[in-house]
Amino acid sequence: MPEALILPGMADAEPDLSTFENKTGLAEDMKFLASMPELCDVTFLVGDTREPVCAVKAVLASRSRVFAKMLYAAPSPQRKRETSTKENKLRLFLKRSSEPLLNLQNAAQQRTGYTQQLAPIPEPSGQQHQTLIIEEFEPDVFRQLIEYIHTGCVTLQPRTLLGVMNAADYYGLEELRRACAGFVQCCINVDTVCALLASAERYIQYKCTKTLVQKVLEFVDEHGTEVLNLGSFTLLPQHVVRLILAREELRADEFTKFQAALMWSKKYYDNNPNIDIKEILGTFCEYIQFHKIPANVLMREIHPLNLVPYAIIMNALAYQADPESIDPGKLSPNSSRQHHRHRHHHQSLPKIRKAKSQSFRTRRSPSERRSPNNAPNLTLNTSLTSGNGEKKRSPLTPKSPVMPVPESKSPGSSSQKTPTSLSRQGTLRASNRRKNSGQLSISLGTQGRRSPVGLNDRSPQGRRSPLFPSSGLRSPNDPMTSPTVRSPTGEPRRSSPTFSVHTQERRSPLGAVAPTDFGCQFGVPGTRRSPTSTVHVQDMATEPEEAGFVGLKRPSISLFTPIYFASEKRSPMGPIPPITVSNPAETYKSAEREREAAEAAAREKEKEKEKEAAQPQEKKSVMREILAFVRKPSKHLSSRTNRFANAFTRAESGSSGGPLIRQSTFSASPAASSTAAKSAVQKQMSEVGFEPKISQKFTHYAKMSLRLRRSTKRDDEEKEKQKQSSASGSKRPSADLSQTNADQQVGGSSDELPFELANVHFEKVGESYIKHERLRELQEPEVVKEEDTEKDAEAEVEVEQTDAAMAQFVEEVTNSLKVVALNGEGGTAAVHHFTRRSESREPIEPRISEERESDSNDLMIPDDMRAELVEILKAYPPEPVYVNLQALRRETEDADLAIAQAEAAALAAAEPAKKPLQCPTIEFEPPSRRSSFDPPRSPFLEQLRSPGVDTETDLINLQRLDSGGDSFELVESKWSKSSRGESSFDCPYSSRDTSFDVSISRYQSTSYEDQTSSFEIVDTDEKGQGRRAVDLRKSSIELVDAETFQRSGSSCGGRKSSLETHFDYTPTEGGGRSPSLPFPAMSKKQRTENFRQLHVSQFSAFSRARSPLSQQTSSNYSSRDSYDSSGSYPHGYGYPPEPQRSPYGDPSRKHFPLTVRQKGEEEREVRTFLCTDQRCASIFEPRPSSVLTQQLSTGSMSTPSGYTNGTPRIPGAAPVGPVPLPHPSAPLSSCGFSSGSEFEPPSPRRAASASPKHTFTFRIVMKKVDSSPEALCPERHRSRIIDRYRRRDSRRKRIHDAGKSF
C-alpha cells in the first residue's frame, strides 16, 4: 500500500529513484497466466463452443467485484465442481486452445486435483480447480477481458470491441469500458463498420450496444454507398441489413440498396440453398424504393434477374411514367412490405396469378378483394383499389376504378367477377366475363382490367382514359393506383397507369369466349378487354371526350378491347395480361391535362356511354367506333408513352386471338428496356407458354421493343381460318363489316391515332395456339387494324383510313396473292396491304403486329376501294396459309400470274401518290428453347433441330412450335423463313419505315442468360421532324470491340462507344412510315421485302433508337444483317453516302453506300448499302441467300447472296426511281443487304458469336430513311419479286433443309 500512496505523487515529483515500477514487465509476465493452466485455478468454458479460458481466481476477484462474488461467494466449491464433469474435463482436454500441451497438463492437474478432492471439501482448497460456463460472451471477447484483468493491458479490435465493452460493463471494469467507448469513435470506418454491426447482433441486449450501434448507424448513413458495396455487408445479420436499408437517412441510391440486398441474399442463399432466393430478397424489397431507380436500370439490371416481383417493377415504371397514377402509399416501404410478402407467397405462382393475388400495392385485403362487385373474382384489382376504398374497383373495375361500380355491374363486369377471371392481373378473367363483355357494356372498367382507357381517362396510357371520366373515380393515376397501373403482377407494380397492365388478363385464353364470342365481343369489344388491352394510351391529348367517350360508346370497346370477329378465333391459350408501361413524363403531364378536361367531358360522356353501353350498337357501328376510338388516342400519347402502352398491349385485337404473353415491353422510351420486356415476353412464352411470366432475365439487357408478334400460332390460326373462310367463302363477313367500319372510323379519327408501341403479342406457338392464331387472325384484322391505325394514325392520318380497312382486309385476306393482283387494280395501297397481310398469314412469318399492323392500318382502303376489294376478295378464295412450302410454291407460281396482273394493275395505279407502303406486321415468336443457347442459331437450324421435321411444312410448323419455346425466333413466313430469313427480321415486310425494326428481334433472342448481350432500341423518334434525307432506319450493325467498345468499322456518326447498339432511328415525321409515299408497282415479293425492310412503323423504329446490343452473344439473331454493315455508312448518318463510282469497284469495300432517290412527294435520297461481301451472310448462320432479304428499305439487311453480286436476284427487281446505283437492279440489292451464301465460311463475327461470350458489341445503327418501297422499287416489281421470293424460298427452304451443314 505504501506504493499506492507514493504513486499518486510520482507524476508530480521527479522520478523517485527509491521507487521502482515495472508495470509493463508485470503485465508481460502476467500474460503467461493465460498460457500456464497449471498456475490457474479456474477455467471458464466460454461461448457456444465452450472454449476454455483459464484464469487465476484471486486476480479476478481482486480486480472485479463481479468475479469476486462469482468465485468466492459460491455456496460450495463441490457444487461448482459438479459442473465440471468428466465430459467437461474431456472437453477441456480436447478443446482447441492456444497451448494444447498446457491444456493437457491442466487436464491432468485437474484430474489429480479432483481425486484429492473426492472427499467432501469443507473449504475450497488451493488445489481446487473450478470450471465455470460463460455463455454471454464470445471466447475471443472473454479472453481479452481476462487478459486485461490479469495484465491491465489489452489490444482493442473493432471485431471484438463491442463485446469487450459490454463485458467490461458487465464485470464492473469501468476503465476498460470507457476505453472501448473512446475507441469506438476512432475505429468506426468503412472497413470496420460491418464488423461492428455484426457483433452488435450478439450483444444487442446490453445498454452499451445501443449507444455504439447508434453511432455506427450514423456512420453508415453518411457513407451509405460505400458501406452497401462492402463485401462484408453480406455477413451482417438479416435484421441489421433491413435496419440499414430501411433508414431514411441512408445516403445511397435505391439501386445500390438493391444490389446490396441482392448480394446479401445470394450469400444467404449459398448457405441456405433450400430457401428460394426470391423469398430472401423479398424481405428487403419493401425497403427499396424501386420507383426511384431509372426505368432503364430497372428493366436492364433488375427485371432480368426475375427476383423482384413484377408488380413492384411495374408500379415503379408506372410511377415514373405518371406519379399520379400510383398511390404513393403503394410506393412506400411499409405498403410495399406487405405487398411483397404477398408477392413472395405467390412467387412460385405464374406471374399472372401473382399479379392477381399480388397486385403489389394493390393487394387489398381478401375481403376488399372480394369487393361486392368482384366478390367472385379474385380480381386483386379490387385490392388494387387499396388506396381508394371508394374506388375499390368492382371486380370489373377491380383495377380500374374508373368504371367501378356501374361498369362492374355491367355484364362485362360480371365476367370480371368470374372467379376465374383474375381481374386484369389474373388474366384469367373468366371467359364469361369476356362473353359478358359481349354485352356492349362499355364497362371498360368492368372489363376487369379497366381498359386503360376507361381506367385512366387521363393517362394517355392507362390513366383512365378521358373516355371514362368516371367523374367520381379519380383517375387511376390519382392516389388510387390506377388499376391499370397495377400490373397484372400487381404486387409490386406501382400501379403505373401505363402499366395498367391491362392485363386484361388476357383472360381465359383469348377467347374465353367461344370464337363466335369474339364476334359478339366484337360488338362489345370494350367489355372483353382486348387481351392486348392496349392501355389506351389515348393521349390525354386526345380529347378525352372523343377518345374516352368513343371508347364508352363502343360499348367498352376500348382501344384495348380486342375486337373479335365473328369467325371463331378462340385462342386455346390461357389469357396473358399485357403490361403497359407509359412514359412517365409524357403520361404524367398528359394525364394531368387530360384528367381535368376529360373528367368533365368524360362524366357527361360516361353517362351517355352508360346508356349506349346498355344498348349494344350494331357491330358495324361498334367497330366503327372502336376504330375511331382507336385512332382517337391523341398523338401525344402516341408518343413514346403510347408506344409504351402499346408495347404492353397486344396488337389491338389483332392478336387478341391468342393469349398475350404478358406483353411487357417496358417503357417504350428509349431507355425503357423494351428489350427487357421483350425478353420477358420471350421467356414467358418459352417458360410458361403464355404465362404472363415475363422472363425475368430479359435477354439480359437486350432492349428491344417487342413488336406484337403474331405468333406462328396466329399464322397457323390464320391458315386455318383461311381454310375455313375459303370453305365458307369470304372469310371475313364480319371482317368486311369491321373493315368498313374501320375505314369509316379511321377516316374520322385517323388524325388522332397515336402510334401504339406495336403491341407485343407473344404467343406460344403451339399446335393449339396455332389454331387459335388462325382464328384470331381472322377476327383480328379489325382489331389489329384499329390498333395499327392508332399507331399509324399519327404518322399516316390520311392513309390510315385505307390502312385500317386494309389492315382488316389484309388480315383476313392476308397472303392473298390474288388479292395482291386485285389490289393492284384496287389501288397500290391495297396491294401492299394485302401483301403485307398475306405475309402475316405466312405461317412462319413473324409479324410485328404493331409495326406491321400499323402499316396495314396505314393502308386502310377507302370505302369505295374497299368495297371493290371486298368484292374481289370474295371472288377469290382466301389465300391459304401455306402449311406446305410446296403448296406455297404452287401458290406462289399461281401468284406469278396474279403478280403479272397485279403489276399491270399496279402500273395503272402504280404510284398512288399517297398510298403508304404496307408492311407486313412482323411477329416475333417467342424464343424457342434453342435461343437460350449461346451459340447463334439460325431459324433454319431451328428447323433442323425440330423433332420430326421432314417437310418444309413440318419445319415451318415445328419452327413455330419451337418458337413457342424459349428462343425468340422470328417466325418466318414461307419466304421469310427461307429467304427473308436472311434478315434479322423474318417478317418479309419487316420494316417499312424502319428497316430494322425487326432486325432487332434476332438480336433480342439471345439466351436469356446472356448477360453480355444487351440490345436496346432507343427511340429517337422525332415525330416533329420532316422526313430525313437519310434513312436512320437503315441500320447497320457495327461490331464493337468489347473491351474498348470502339467501332470495329467506321460506324456512322460518332456512335457512342458502348455496348449499345444504337438504333438511331428517327422516324420520319410521318410517324415512321411514309404516309404519302405510294409504292411503285412492285412484285409481291418485292413488296414483302420492302415491307419487311421498309415497313417499320414508327414504333418499330422508334424503339430502336439505341440499344446496347452490347455483346450480343450467340444469338441467332446476332445481326447477320450487318456484320460489315458497321462500316456501311462511313459517312455520318446525316450524309447519304455518295454512290461509289462502281459500288463494286472498290475491292477493299464490301458494303457500298448507295443513294437511292425515292419517288416520294419529294424526292429524297435514301442511303442504302449494297453488300458484296460474302462474309455478311456468314455472319449469321448461313441462311439461304434470298433476294427476299433485300430490305428495300435500307439498311444493311443481309443481302441474299444474289445481292452480294450487286445484282438483285429478283428478275422483277427493276431500278425504281432515280437510283444512282451501278446496276439498274441495284436499288433493290443496294438496300444494304449483305448476306453471303449460306455455306460460306463463317465470318469472324459469326465465329465469335458462336462462343457463348463473344466479345462483340453489336452496334446496330439504324438510320431512318424514308424509303418507301415505292421509291426503291415499283409496286409491280415488288409484287413480282415477292412472289418470286416465295417460290424461291420454298425451293430454297427445301434445299436448305436437305443441305444444312450445321
From Swiss-Prot:
Bias type Basic and acidic residues, positions: 589-623, 713-723, 836-855
Composition skew (Basic residues), residue ranges: 337-364
Residue spans of biased composition, Low complexity class: 664-680, 1047-1056, 1107-1128, 1226-1252
SMART domains recorded: BACK (SM00875), BTB (SM00225)
Renumbered residue ranges of the record's region Disordered: 325-532, 575-624, 648-685, 701-752, 834-858, 1045-1090, 1102-1163, 1187-1252
Pfam family, one: BACK
Domain BTB intervals: 40-158
Biased composition (Polar residues): 378-388, 410-430, 437-449, 472-487, 736-748, 1187-1207
Entry-linked PANTHER family: HL07962P-RELATED (PTHR24410), SERINE-ENRICHED PROTEIN (PTHR24410:SF46)
Name this protein carries in UniProt: Serine-enriched protein
Species whose genome carries this gene: Drosophila melanogaster
Gene responsible for this protein: gprs
